[in-house]
């Protein structure tokens, strides 16, 4: 699950390379070239792994390229929250997304729950997922907050 080949110590305010992480687990901040990312990037990846386990899909977001990866995320997470995230931080979508990123509604997690995976999807797990897979990196749970989540009290 971990590739230490690109590991670095984190220093707040430092700009990092966005060409890190395995594509299907990349947080949206990497896909829009936000170079001042932080630990919250790892929590997005944890959410991707959790979703794969819960919904028995590998991976949840399966883009064919970095550009397609953000489109796959938007097809599930919706476009509206992505646009709010961009506006909040004064970010622009890279040019390669022009004409490709449509107005996708957010899909509820219930669309991914079936009889065969229901036993892996208690409400606490769905709530944890909902707080990890968040466009806005500052609104995602931290690792400490995630460990205090009711899911881990089951």
Question: What function would you assign to each model-found segment?
Answer:
Residues 57-65:
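Activation segment of protein kinase catalytic domains
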Residues 1-23:
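Activation segment/activation loop of eukaryotic-type protein kinase catalytic domains
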Residues 29-41, 55:
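Conserved end of the kinase activation segment
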Residues 43-53:
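A conserved short alpha-helix in the C-terminal lobe
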């Amino acid at each position: 699950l971990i590739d230490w080949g690109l590991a670095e110590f984190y220093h707040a305010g430092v700009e990092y390379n966005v060409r890190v992480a395995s594509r299907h687990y990349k947080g949206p901040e990497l896909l829009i070239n936000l170079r001042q990312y932080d630990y919250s990037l790892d929590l997005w990846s944890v959410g991707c792994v959790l979703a794969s386990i819960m919904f028995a899909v590998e991976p949840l977001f399966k883009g064919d390229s970095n550009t397609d990866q953000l489109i796959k995320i938007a097809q599930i997470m919706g476009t509206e929250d992505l646009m709010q995230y961009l506006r909040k931080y004064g970010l622009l979508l890279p040019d390669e997304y022009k004409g490709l990123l449509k107005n996708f509604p957010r899909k509820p997690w219930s669309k991914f729950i079936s009889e065969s995976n229901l036993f892996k999807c208690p409400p606490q797990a769905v709530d944890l997922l909902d707080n990890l897979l968040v466009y806005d990196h500052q609104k995602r749970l931290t690792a400490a907050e995630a460990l205090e989540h009711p899911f881990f009290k089951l």
